[in-house]
């Protein structure tokens, strides 16, 4: 830890600006292990990230070289989520699927449903 602190450290905002990505993307890189970082106070979860310039350069080099062609094709072929066409699995059909599942899992009765607020007497085969 002291090794990192002795070098010139960068905040998350400064590191993101150097790399050319957003701060959220930089946080995701930290979670994925793409970039090495140190917390200002390692004993606190909410402690801010600290980066070195060397770690930023290494992360950029490694992130460019580790993407395979198939991953790049997947990234390029992603479609906008707000398309006009409703497909199975979207929010609209998910509601419909939940409703159908609820109907299938509902408790079934052999007889008609009875209201217990009326004075109707039940016949239990006596």
Curated annotation (Swiss-Prot):
Residues 114-126 have a biased composition (Polar residues). Excisionase and integrase are necessary for the excision of prophage from the host genome by site-specific recombination. The gene is 40. The keyword DNA-binding applies. This is Probable excisionase. GO terms for molecular function: DNA binding. InterPro entries: DNA-bd_dom_put_sf, Lambda_DNA-bd_dom_sf. Keywords: DNA recombination, DNA-binding, Viral genome excision. GO terms for biological process: DNA recombination; provirus excision. Disulfide bonds: none annotated. Residues 99-126 are annotated as: Disordered.
């Amino acid at each position: 830890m002291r090794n990192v602190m002795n070098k010139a450290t960068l905040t998350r905002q400064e590191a993101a600006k150097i790399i050319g990505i957003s701060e959220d993307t930089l946080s995701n890189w930290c979670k994925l292990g793409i970039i090495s970082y140190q917390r200002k106070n390692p004993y606190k979860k909410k402690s801010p990230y600290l980066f070195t310039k060397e770690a930023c350069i290494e992360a950029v080099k490694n992130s460019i070289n580790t993407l395979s062609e198939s991953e790049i094709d997947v990234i390029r072929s992603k479609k906008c989520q707000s398309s006009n066409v409703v497909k199975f699995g979207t929010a609209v059909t998910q509601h419909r699927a939940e409703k159908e599942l609820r109907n299938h899992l509902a408790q079934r009765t052999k007889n008609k449903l009875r209201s217990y607020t009326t004075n109707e007497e039940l016949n239990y085969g006596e």
